[in-house]
């Protein structure tokens, strides 16, 4: 048994009393989100919390880490002076496997090239009581859904798509490694009490429309920052008509609208999924308190009264969507895609169709996509685009192979890649990508930022459901509408694809030979963790220097980032994943994807030391060598995307002191705070335009740093003229202590 049934029983045994107490204190019916939040408080509840205002300490039930972020998280935990993790924790090896040839060869290549890292993660897991999932076992969030997620629980994970577990009724939140280390060390986890967005679903999906289309539609409504600081709670009769893995897909892409997390109330589809994945005991326990595992009826009857925002979607009227390119919130119904392509001059020919990722790699996803592939074979159609599949877990892969789905894909010349993230995170050796030709691909993933999948800035990536991806790949035409259009087959006949079919769960049940799980030793005190001092992949961490309590003066502008600046721009993935455990080496990718506002180029900035232009990391290292502080300036939603704390640790390691932006993405702002950085926002957004390429920053009143106060900055321009700007921050007293001590980890060590 990989899940902790005693922990789950403990959560359920206290949930009723905690929720009843919260209803009395709050004096109103509760949403599901509030029930889970209030039943996971670190301290006793004596007053209701203000949404979007109050910082609250929580006690999550478990933690999940993937291999790219786990390296830095565990390197930090090793410094915390603890002998074992305080809550159930798992590590999943899914990020360090590149898609190139196919499942077997690619997995072996990953083991050959990253064995040092895998061995490190396995030994650290064994030493500190952490469950370990081997390379090839599956994608973290699919494995969590199959084994660990449970209705009414709270978990955190060092990956932004941890939110996927909301499909099984959890409040599951992506965090940086330093947040995870707090909880591993037995401390509370802090979060600003979220606002609540309610999405009422009516009707029922049919035809070509899938659960993916719900979140593609929501992304178009909310945009990439519309969910920031909020939990999205789905409810209504339409929600009950969705499968559990379909709910997971919807929650997964809540990360793309900036939501803290998303969730659904416990229902029959969740019970069926729990039982199908061998967790009857959890289903039985959940059924005993099922009224506490969903929102109160009064809330759903009058949602405008209890949610900060309400969206309503009729599933019976919802069209299939294709979102993109370059941003997951550019939502286009399939019926409008042809005219939209022409209007925007996007490449119409599809080069690749990719199915998988943590968003859409379930048994249901593969079964529905394979029904389209099977039709193509039966109707004498060939795929006009290359086709790739990443199953979500070994359990899904094994069962899908048994039931003939993989054979169907392979007969259509699809490549079946390893049970891993692969192309979704840039782990894709795509042939010809280095030519940087303008082209289009379509995938069932979650993100489609420039260069993310294949490193080519001219690849237009579009997001859709697995069944639409299959249809578009077969047609080779992004403007193809399978609901209305026909195709000409290999015999010259006009044929039409019929609506997809499939199974929510395998009729013959799930089956797996070796799921890839390694249980840790009961006592890991004798387990030795070795890091080679000459390693290029792993490096022991040195503590960051505490603040000296003085104003920062004479700081130089490093880069003023123009437009979208995601964590992919700040700390690229792809080939850089190999250095995720070596802070100094991975810092050589710091901000190399950010666009310089002064010349619109990437990784090409001016040095104020000599007036010459060069790469961001190289110039920043020179500033550090000369003991010169630097400032990074950015636009809206700075740091959106991945939870990777490297995007905060790299600039901190290289000597950047401050980041000033119009607005932050939630996880990145927290990561900056945790690493002892100063994260500020412009009081007047137009002050962004005042900042010039040769500016020097003098912080006038930083020495009075306190909760709620503004920080005043003097900008000194190269001609000697000056501007005074005001900036805001969201640091509370605890977070100011992180800044004073140099990092949150320094504070943990101080109290150990």
Describe the residue ranges of each PLM region.
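Extracellular/luminal Protease-associated
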Residues: 235-240, 624-664
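Flexible inter-domain linker/hinge segments
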Residues: 5, 16-21, 36-42, 46, ...
């Amino acid at each position: 048994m990989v899940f902790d049934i005693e922990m789950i029983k403990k959560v359920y045994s206290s949930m009723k009393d905690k929720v009843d107490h919260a209803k009395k204190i709050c004096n109103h019916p509760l949403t599901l989100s509030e029930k889970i939040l209030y039943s996971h408080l670190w301290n006793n509840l004596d007053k209701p919390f203000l949404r979007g205002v109050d910082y609250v300490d929580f006690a999550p039930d478990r933690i999940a880490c993937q291999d790219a972020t786990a390296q830095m998280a565990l390197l930090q935990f090793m410094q915390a002076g603890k002998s074992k993790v305080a809550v159930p924790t798992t590590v999943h090896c899914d990020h360090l496997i590149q898609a190139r040839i196919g499942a077997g060869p690619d997995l072996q290549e990953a083991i050959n090239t990253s064995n040092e890292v895998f061995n490190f993660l396995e030994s650290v897991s064994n030493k500190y009581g952490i469950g370990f999932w081997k390379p090839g076992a599956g994608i973290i969030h699919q494995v969590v859904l199959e084994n660990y997620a449970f209705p009414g629980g709270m978990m955190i994970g060092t990956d932004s798509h941890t939110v996927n577990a909301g499909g099984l009724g959890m409040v599951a939140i992506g965090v940086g490694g330093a947040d995870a280390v707090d909880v591993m060390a037995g401390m509370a986890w802090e979060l600003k009490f979220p606002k609540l967005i309610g999405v009422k679903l009516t009707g029922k999906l049919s035809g070509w429309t899938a659960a993916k289309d719900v979140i593609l539609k929501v992304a178009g409504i909310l945009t990439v920052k519309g969910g920031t600081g909020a939990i999205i709670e789905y409810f209504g009769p339409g929600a009950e008509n969705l499968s559990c893995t379909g709910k997971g897909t919807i929650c997964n892409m809540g990360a793309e609208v900036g939501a803290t997390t998303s969730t659904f109330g416990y229902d029959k589809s969740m019970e069926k999924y729990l039982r199908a994945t061998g967790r009857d005991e959890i289903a039985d326990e959940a059924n005993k308190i099922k009224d506490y595992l969903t929102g109160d009826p009064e809330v759903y009857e009058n949602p405008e009264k209890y949610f900060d925002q309400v969206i309503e979607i009729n599933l019976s009227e919802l069209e299939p969507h294709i979102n993109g390119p370059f941003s997951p919130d550019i939502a286009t119904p399939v019926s409008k895609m042809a005219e939209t392509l022409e209007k925007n001059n996007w490449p119409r020919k599809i080069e690749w169709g990719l199915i998988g990722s943590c968003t859409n790699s379930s048994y249901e996803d593969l079964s529905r996509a394979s029904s389209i592939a099977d039709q193509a074979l039966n109707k004498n159609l060939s795929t006009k685009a290359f086709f790739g599949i990443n199953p979500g877990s070994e359990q899904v892969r094994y069962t899908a192979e048994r039931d003939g789905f993989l054979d169907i894909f392979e007969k259509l010349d699809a490549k079946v890649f390893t049970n891993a993230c692969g192309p979704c995170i840039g782990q894709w050796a795509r042939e010809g990508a280095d030519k940087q030709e303008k082209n289009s691909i379509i995938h069932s993933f979650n993100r489609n930022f420039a260069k993310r999948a294949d490193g080519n800035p001219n690849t237009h990536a579009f997001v859709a459901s697995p069944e639409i991806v299959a249809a578009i790949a077969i047609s080779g035409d992004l403007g193809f509408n399978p609901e209305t259009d026909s195709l000409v087959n290999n015999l010259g006949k006009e044929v039409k694809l019929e609506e997809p079919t499939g199974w929510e769960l395998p009729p013959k049940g799930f089956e797996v030979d070796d799921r890839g799980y390694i249980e840790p030793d009961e006592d890991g005190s004798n387990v030795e963790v070795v890091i080679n001092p000459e390693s290029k992949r792993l490096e022991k961490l040195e503590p960051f220097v505490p603040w000296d309590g003085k104003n920062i003066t004479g700081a130089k502008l490093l880069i003023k980032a123009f437009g979208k600046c995601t964590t992919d721009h700040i700390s690229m993935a792809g080939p850089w994943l190999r250095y995720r455990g070596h802070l100094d080496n991975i810092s050589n990718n710091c901000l190399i994807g950010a666009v310089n506002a002064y010349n619109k180029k990437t990784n090409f900035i001016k040095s104020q030391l000599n007036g010459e232009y060069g790469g961001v990391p190289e110039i920043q290292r020179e500033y550090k060598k000369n003991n010169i502080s630097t400032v990074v300036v950015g636009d809206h939603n700075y740091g959106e995307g991945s939870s990777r704390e490297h995007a905060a640790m790299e600039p901190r390691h290289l000597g950047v002191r401050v980041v000033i932006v119009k607005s932050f993405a939630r996880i990145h702002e927290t990561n900056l705070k945790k690493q002892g950085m100063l994260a500020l926002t412009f009081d007047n957004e137009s002050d962004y335009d005042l900042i010039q390429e040769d500016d020097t920053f003098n912080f006038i009143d930083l020495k009075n740093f306190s909760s709620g106060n503004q920080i005043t900055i003097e900008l000194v321009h190269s001609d000697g003229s000056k501007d005074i700007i005001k900036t805001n921050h969201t640091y509370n007293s605890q977070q100011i202590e992180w800044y004073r001590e140099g990092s949150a980890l320094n504070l943990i060590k101080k109290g150990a």
